[in-house]
């Protein structure tokens, strides 16, 4: 038996990176997944690689109608929804005084409003299942330790953290059997991280060496390490855990 036996997840940003790996791990542990992503063809290919207990749907998290359609597709395909992973997000650099306003609005819209939309539409569907459910939102170590060059991203992820706690307390007050928690990744080897390395003025190898040298455990994190924290929060093993934060950053938040 796997830790996700009988559970059904909808994952935003499910085509690749942390979301894609979370989908893979969810299926490996016995669950079923609907991979929602704006990159539909990539999500479909990933779902096909995972077998019969995976499917894909187009999902722009800014679009409430697409969220409604994604939840409906999940219920039609797998009969219910028990788990929501809000993973989709973007990160664009810029300090407060010079950040492009379109970039600011886009980051807040996708990272914060997208997560809100998922919670708003996903919660009633999870309650409808009649089973214990879980919502796991993706924050960032920059929600705890903001970066001066990432004003919009830091602010959006701090807001996601507060949103998660607010929803968790609401569910508890209403006796809803749904737990809500946040996972905060540090630097994780994903397409987003590779874009950071590509922007480094030196070579790729130099960028990796500089990062590893300055990191407490001398390496970048793996998407699976974040996904496994997400699965634990979605499993019955964490039944007394809600309104909490798990940071998966190899100690990066506290480096000297």
Residue ranges, per PLM feature:
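Short, small/polar-rich loop/turn modules that mediate ligand/substrate recognition or access, typified
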Residues: 177-179, 241-243
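Canonical Rossmann dinucleotide-binding motif of NAD(H)/NADP(H)-dependent dehydrogenases/reductases
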Residues: 3-34
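Short C-terminal tail/terminal secondary-structure segment
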Residues: 3, 145, 230-231, 242-256
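Residue(s) in the substrate-gating loop at a strand-loop-helix junction
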Residues: 140
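Substrate-binding pocket helix/loop in short-chain dehydrogenase/reductase
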Residues: 95-96, 100-108, 207, 211
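Active-site helix of classical SDR
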Residues: 119, 156, 164
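Alpha-helical segment proximal to the catalytic Tyr-Lys
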Residues: 124, 169-173, 239
């Amino acid at each position: 038996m796997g830790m996700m036996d009988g559970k059904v997840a909808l994952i935003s940003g499910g085509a690749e990176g942390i979301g894609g790996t979370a989908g893979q791990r969810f299926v490996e542990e016995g669950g079923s997944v609907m991979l929602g992503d704006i990159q539909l063809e990539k999500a479909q290919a990933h779902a096909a690689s995972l077998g019969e207990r995976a499917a894909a749907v187009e999902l722009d998290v800014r679009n409430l109608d697409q969220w409604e359609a994604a939840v409906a597709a999940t219920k039609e395909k797998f009969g219910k929804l028990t788990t929501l992973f809000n993973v989709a997000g973007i990160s664009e650099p810029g300090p407060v005084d010079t950040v492009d306003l379109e970039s600011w609005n886009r980051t807040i819209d996708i990272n914060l409003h997208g997560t809100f939309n998922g919670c708003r539409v996903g919660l009633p569907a999870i309650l409808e299942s009649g089973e214990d459910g879980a919502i796991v939102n993706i924050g960032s170590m920059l929600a705890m330790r903001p970066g001066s060059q990432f004003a919009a991203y830091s602010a959006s992820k701090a807001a996601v953290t507060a949103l998660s706690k607010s929803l968790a307390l609401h569910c508890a007050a209403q006796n809803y059997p749904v737990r809500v928690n946040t996972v905060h990744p540090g630097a994780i080897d994903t397409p987003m991280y590779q874009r950071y390395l590509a922007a480094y003025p030196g070579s790729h190898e130099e960028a990796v060496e500089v990062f590893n040298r300055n990191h407490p455990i001398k390496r970048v994190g793996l998407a699976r390490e974040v996904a496994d924290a997400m699965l634990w929060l979605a499993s019955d093993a964490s039944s007394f855990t809600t309104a909490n934060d798990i940071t998966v950053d190899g100690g990066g938040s506290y480096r000297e």
